[in-house]
Each structure stands twice: as C-alpha cells, then as structure tokens.
Amino acid sequence: MIKLDHLMYAVPDLELGMQQIHELTGIKPVMGGSHPGVGTRNALLSFSADQYLEIIAPDPEQDLAGTTGELLARNPNSGLRAWAVASDDLAAIRDMATQQSVTAREIVDMARTTPDGMALAWKLLF
C-alpha cells in the first residue's frame, strides 16, 4: 500500500510560514512539535484524517550544525519542497526507487512529542 501522506512547505521561520499559509488558505495551522536531532520543528494543516500539509522550519532551540534545520535556515525562500508517501513497507519503496536510479538513503527512525504530550514515532526514507 502506498498513498500520499503529506506535502512539506519549507520556511526559514515557522511563525512566518504559519502566517503565510493562513493568508493563502484562510485556515490557521496548528503547532506540531520539534524533531530532536534533525534541527527542525513543524506546524500542521490537515487535509483529512491522515493527509496534511507540514510547515517545516529550523528549530531555534536546537544546534542546527549539519542538520536539515541548517539547510532550511540558509534558504530565505518559502515554498513546497517535498512530498511524502505512507507505506507499510519502506524497504520495498527504497528498492523500487533504486531500480529507477533514484538515490535513497537508509531508513531512519523519527520521533517527536506533540504539544499535548503524545509521543509519536515513525520511520522515514529520503
């Protein structure tokens, strides 16, 4: 099973990005949380129960050196940067990408805590 999970809207400043999306859509995004060790934090705008727009930005509370947050901080432009699919078999997705000459990194474990204290965990493949 493969389906669209979310779109990533990258911004150099999360509050500014939330304001931009609110002005574009008329819908106010909600705070998501921080991605420890990745240098990012996010806000979310739901499309449905399991599809959303992620507004992702550098996390000023983290050391950004060598992280995705550092890359976002260096780019002053906001915009749609990536999309993500959900799958119950990321290894198969990685293999399909490799067969199509698309470079894929290793699958990594990710986690964050929501503002209301719920722990979330998932696997990620770039």
What do these predicted regions represent?
Residues 1-44:
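An N-terminus-focused feature that recognizes amino-terminal "leader" regions
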Residues 3-13, 41-48, 53, 67-126:
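Vicinal oxygen chelate
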Residues 19, 55, 65, 93-95:
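Short acidic, gly/pro-rich beta-turn/loop elements at beta-sheet edges
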Residues 27-71, 118-126:
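Conserved short beta-strand elements that form part of the metal-binding/catalytic scaffold
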